[in-house]
A protein has these predicted regions:
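N-terminal pre-domain/capping segments
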Residues: 1-94, 193, 256-274
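Generic enzyme active-site microenvironment
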Residues: 28, 59, 144-145, 173-174, ...
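Active-site acidic/histidine proton-transfer and metal-coordination neighborhood
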Residues: 15, 52, 71-171, 273
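Catalytic-core regions built around general acid/base machinery
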Residues: 42-53, 127-135, 187-190, 222-226
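A short acidic, helix-capping loop that chelates divalent metal ions and anchors anionic groups
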Residues: 66-72, 108-115, 206-211, 244-248
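Residue-level detector of anion-binding/catalytic polar loops
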Residues: 27-28, 56, 98, 142, ...
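Histidine-acidic metal/acid-base catalytic patches
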Residues: 1-3, 12-22, 97-98, 130, ...
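Active-site beta-loop-alpha junctions enriched in small/polar residues
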Residues: 7-11, 32-36, 62-65, 105-107, ...
Length: 274
């Protein structure tokens, strides 16, 4: 069984949030949000509130949009993107966060790119990631490359591997609802040596959905057992808002869902109708 964590996406980060985490048995949080949220987060206040209720600041999801401002794969945007992300990494590192989740590109029309254009996108991402890896190292942590949906880079295990080749200090975050097509277990096993954190959510194989496990098509016993087989030592971190797919959830619902998966129980209906 893994300790349970939640992303802050779709949530107000305040003392009430951390108090509810403690009451439910949520071990940690990933700091995430919109671009303007990142610019305005008071990390000192967040750290103080988290410490008060014994909640660990596990990871920091760097902003990935607006796409006309942030894109590590686009020549005209990559330098400023690295600058923005670099400052956020330094700030997060100052408060003990050591895993920085990154999207290696914005939305791109892959089917409209020539081979040379795609290659340049990959090379630009690699250069950007190498720069961020150095900043993260100085901050005491690692940049974690996330697998992404088909309109982005990277979408395949070999593409993630290619990006990781930019710097040996790069690590991986596997998102279980970004394989279109694909199987989360293939990514877990194919990237096991670099895997340090996950984003847990379900989907329908049509688009990313960020649903509660049990609402989609993911085989959660395969995912759980796959993580154990590769000796994954991180957390079971949900990237799901409190309002998702017609349901409203509380921290206790996520804990119940996780425990049902860990104990190989039939997944039920969690939360209340929206």
């Amino acid at each position: 069984m893994y300790k349970i964590a939640l992303s802050s996406t779709g949530k107000v980060i305040d003392e009430k949030l951390f108090e509810s985490f403690k009451e439910a048995g949520i071990h940690a949080i990933e700091i995430s949000g919109l671009f303007e949220d990142h610019m305005n987060y008071d990390m000192g206040h967040i750290k103080k509130a988290a410490d008060k209720f014994g909640v660990k600041l596990w990871s920091y999801h760097l902003p990935f949009k607006p796409f006309d401002i942030i894109d590590l794969s686009k020549r005209e945007l990559c330098k400023n993107s690295v600058k923005i992300m670099g400052e956020l990494i330094k700030r997060a590192g100052d408060y003990g966060i050591d895993k920085y989740i990154v999207h290696s590109s914005g939305i791109i029309k892959r089917d409209e790119l020539s081979q040379d254009e795609f290659h340049d996108r990959m090379e630009c991402s690699k250069e950007s990631l190498a720069a961020l890896a150095e900043i993260a190292h100085r901050a005491g942590g690692n940049v974690c490359v996330e697998n992404l949906p088909p309109k982005c880079i990277p979408t395949k295990v070999d593409e993630v591997r290619e990006l990781l080749s930019a710097d040996d200090r790069l690590r991986v975050c596997v998102d279980t609802n970004h394989m279109l097509p694909g199987n989360p277990v293939d990514f877990i096993k194919g990237l096991a040596d670099k895997l340090v954190t996950v984003h847990i959510s379900d989907y329908d194989l049509i688009n990313e959905r960020h649903w509660m496990p049990g609402q989609g098509v993911v085989n959660w016993q395969e995912v759980y057992n796959g993580l154990k087989e590769v000796n994954y030592s991180g957390l079971w971190l949900y990237e799901i808002g409190y309002k998702s797919n017609g349901r409203i959830y509380s921290p206790k619902d996520f804990v119940q869902n996780a425990n049902d998966i860990f104990e190989n129980k039939k997944l039920g209906v969690y939360g209340i109708e929206q």
